[in-house]
């Protein structure tokens, strides 16, 4: 492999391509003369669009094909949305860089209403995320929630066609695709706790590829890594996946980190919440400790019930 060339495996969706183009531009800015190639490909999660994510099941729906490309030396790195990245990596691969986080909140998108509280009784809301469904149902049990799959453009088209009164999307995706004007309002983390890693971009590569790791190093954003490590550690201890409503959100003030987490019933009938504060350098320990607290408060029975049905 040329010392001056790097190949990026990416999904084909507009948002995934934006993320890959962002990494490409950063590498070209930091390393003048470098040749960066994009290798767009489809993943299982991109192909199976007629089934709710929770039913498709399995971890790594949006990353496996990219990982195979790296293991086969067809690509040097893969760029991921962190909320899609499983906890465990195939042997020989690892998460080398986490880039600076975009807005991690959920966005309320509607052509008719400004917020969830403004929605009329029995309004239809689109989201495929059990985490979002759980929190919406807890505050507005009257709303009808319908599954919503596809890329951002497809989801917006379904809203515009009148299939939904409102849809919930990650704010980061809309901002990156220059679609901020579609956001009727941002949903605060207090109202809808984000998914772990939401809004952050991660870069995976072969762990023994020192050339590539050196090229990637300047893209690392340490504060984002601490936040995402804590959120992922909580999720790992809870053995979270698409089938369970789990939210995790870390914030940093100076050297202190505050991590909030929740586990809920998909129907919103029960939500277990917790919060923990400690040194940001102990991000992983904080995540595990908060998970243990949630389990002791009753999250274990919720998780056991959900996985028994899966």
From Swiss-Prot:
SUPFAM superfamilies: Periplasmic binding protein-like II, Porphobilinogen deaminase (hydroxymethylbilane synthase), C-terminal domain. Pathway: Porphyrin-containing compound metabolism; protoporphyrin-IX biosynthesis; coproporphyrinogen-III from 5-aminolevulinate: step 2/4. Its EC number is 2.5.1.61. It is an enzyme of class 2 (transferase). The modification S-(dipyrrolylmethanemethyl)cysteine is found at residue 242. HAMAP family: Porphobil_deam. NCBIfam families: hemC. Belongs to the HMBS family. This is Porphobilinogen deaminase. It comes from Shewanella baltica (strain OS223). The lineage of its organism: Bacteria, Pseudomonadati, Pseudomonadota, Gammaproteobacteria, Alteromonadales.
């Amino acid at each position: 492999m040329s010392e001056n060339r790097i190949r990026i495996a990416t999904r084909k969706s507009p948002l995934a391509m934006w993320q890959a183009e962002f990494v490409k531009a950063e590498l070209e800015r930091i390393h003048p003369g470098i040749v960066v190639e994009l290798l767009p490909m489809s993943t299982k999660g991109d192909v199976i669009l007629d089934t709710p994510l929770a039913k498709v099941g399995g971890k790594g729906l949006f990353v496996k094909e990219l990982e195979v490309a790296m293991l086969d030396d067809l690509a040097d790195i893969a760029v991921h949305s962190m909320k899609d990245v499983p906890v465990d990596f195939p042997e020989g691969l690892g998460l080398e860089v986490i880039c600076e986080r975009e807005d991690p909140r959920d966005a309320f998108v509607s052509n008719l209403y400004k917020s969830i509280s403004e929605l009329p009784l029995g309004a239809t809301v689109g989201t495929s995320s059990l985490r979002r469904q759980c929190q919406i149902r807890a505050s507005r049990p009257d709303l009808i929630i319908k599954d919503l799959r596809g890329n951002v453009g497809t989801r917006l088209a379904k809203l515009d066609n009148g299939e939904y009164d409102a849809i919930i999307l990650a704010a980061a995706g809309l901002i990156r695709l220059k679609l901020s004007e579609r956001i009727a309002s941002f949903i605060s983390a207090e109202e809808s706790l984000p998914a772990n890693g939401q809004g952050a971009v991660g870069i995976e590569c072969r762990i023994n590829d020192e050339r590539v790791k050196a090229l990637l190093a300047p893209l690392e954003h340490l504060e984002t890594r601490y936040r995402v490590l804590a959120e992922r550690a909580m999720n790992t201890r809870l053995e979270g996946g698409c089938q369970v409503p789990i939210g995790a959100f870390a914030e940093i003030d100076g050297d202190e980190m505050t991590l909030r987490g929740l586990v809920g019933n998909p129907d919103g009938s029960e939500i277990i919440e917790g919060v923990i504060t400690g040194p940001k350098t102990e991000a992983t320990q904080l995540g595990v400790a908060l998970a243990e607290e949630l389990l002791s408060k009753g999250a274990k029975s919720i998780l056991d019930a959900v996985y028994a049905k899966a």
